[in-house]
């Protein structure tokens, strides 16, 4: 065991003759003295790292103080925080207990405040004094005050998370170290308890670092518990302690308020010769803290100090509010540019992964734009982007998918050929449409499209067949006139009547596969997918599958031939379909019209019809099973889709056509099966 530590006088002689040692540490000169202990500087024998050694004489302690000392040792062993003085080792002898702790070169906050006018003469504080000079008649600069407050709050928050109450927060127990930058270049190495022990957790890295010390009166005290021990320094005691009342952890907040007041003004808020006089002065203020005339204090600090120095602990600021106060967590105003914390730009996750895997980067670059992952760039608002239709048509005629997809980093399928007879108006690009995930475009509601997508797969066809069908669809565009709510279709029935191949189609395999198209006009720049020709269009254009009969179509053709309307003889359809002289509008009715009412209108108009231009209500979904009613709409007519896409879909249930076209649709099984 080590012998009794020397006094300051003998320590000087010991340094000349050979320093005393305690375990692995060498004792130096005295740097502080308290009621029951002396504090010496020291260093580690091997690393020469500086330490502070607190030597307590056991003979001067009563049982209560001895219990407090052992309690302090147990608490310090469990605490590891950048703003709490760490305990390295504890060496006990017959007469002394020696606590080896972190070394704080600048002393305590009380000394720092008293010597504030001489900060410019100390190399460790010279830069701080130049940037944040002290105002005459006031305390520390507000930037320095807020800096120390944030670090003290960080330490107290750590204690509250462990249900500790310090009970002796005062400037004498707040120790200071030079800033990390100064220590790195000038100071001798300091023995640390952890890797981040000397890295500030709050405040500014360019200013001195604060650490909370002296846990002799600390104890475990949950937020719902009370204590009744009279302890701490009277000038910084909470009034409930001075009144010998039971108190909770909020007593530390009162002490924080007194320390904050002393930092900003240079003196304690209340001074007296004894406890009674001190309590009387506190009661006399009635929670209205007075400041010296020369003190420079911001409104935020005045407000915070008022909340902390509230006599009634119930009305006093809570710890949660204190830790979230803008003064504690917010940026410090008035900081010089050199001290503003630099925000490190960290690479994104994708960039880090590509840097770690060069092969993946090469593979990503090798991918085509269609295969690359979707990224959403920052795009202007919809009002800022207007694309004239003429320009869109010119681009989409070349390679719209590649041009738009590569230019904006968006994966797009090939777009359909634009219509030359579509309404000539500009279309806007929106962030929503450009940032939309790469899916098959659908002009119907999303829910309906998802349900149908699960029920049937989309048939893949070769590009040659797609091009031919797209040309045929382009021929049909010439016979469609778009008016707000009326769409006129003329070519479909004539193609059926004029094409003899329709008689060889099978009713079992004849089905119309719903094609996914993007909502919007045919020249929309939102990246609608290229429409593959549907079965119905192929049937209409004479592209049915050979070897399959379709008696319904044959019946429709015969009914067309026997109708009162004069018809051209059946002939192969090798070119574009003939123009129809009479226009028969396709009317979209509201879904509120019942099936019975529509059937009645069908009979009424059918019996009174004597001309080709008479209109008959056709309920397209009458021949469908109930399970298909919610999914069927005019979107199943692929040549209509580009023209009715901007219209609401829920009202598209009933169609007004001439009798001939109604018979064709009614008898064409591809509209009534496996939709």
UniProtKB/Swiss-Prot annotation:
One of its GO terms (biological process) is protein transport. The active site is at 168 (proton acceptor). One of its GO terms (molecular function) is protein serine kinase activity. Pfam families: Pkinase (PF00069). This is Serine/threonine-protein kinase ATG1. GO terms for cellular component: autophagosome; cytosol; phagophore assembly site membrane. Residues 25-328 form the Protein kinase domain. It comes from the Eukaryota. Residues 390-399, 516-538, 556-565 have a biased composition (Polar residues). Keywords: ATP-binding, Autophagy, Cytoplasm, Kinase, Membrane, Nucleotide-binding, Protein transport, Serine/threonine-protein kinase, Transferase, Transport. It catalyses: L-seryl-[protein] + ATP = O-phospho-L-seryl-[protein] + ADP + H(+); L-threonyl-[protein] + ATP = O-phospho-L-threonyl-[protein] + ADP + H(+). Residues 339-374 have a biased composition (Basic and acidic residues). Residues 339-455, 501-577 are annotated as: Disordered. Its EC number is 2.7.11.1. It comes from Colletotrichum lindemuthianum (Bean anthracnose fungus). PANTHER family: NON-SPECIFIC SERINE_THREONINE PROTEIN KINASE (PTHR24348:SF22), SERINE/THREONINE-PROTEIN KINASE UNC-51-RELATED (PTHR24348). Serine/threonine protein kinase involved in the cytoplasm to vacuole transport (Cvt) and found to be essential in autophagy, where it is required for the formation of autophagosomes. Involved in the clearance of protein aggregates which cannot be efficiently cleared by the proteasome. Required for selective autophagic degradation of the nucleus (nucleophagy) as well as for mitophagy which contributes to regulate mitochondrial quantity and quality by eliminating the mitochondria to a basal level to fulfill cellular energy requirements and preventing excess ROS production. It is a peripheral membrane protein. The keyword Magnesium does not apply. ATP binds at residues 31-39, 54. It is an enzyme of class 2 (transferase). Belongs to the protein kinase superfamily. Ser/Thr protein kinase family. APG1/unc-51/ULK1 subfamily. Homodimer. Forms a ternary complex with ATG13 and ATG17. It is found in: Cytoplasm; Preautophagosomal structure membrane. The keyword Amino-acid biosynthesis does not apply. PROSITE patterns: PROTEIN_KINASE_ATP, PROTEIN_KINASE_DOM, PROTEIN_KINASE_ST.
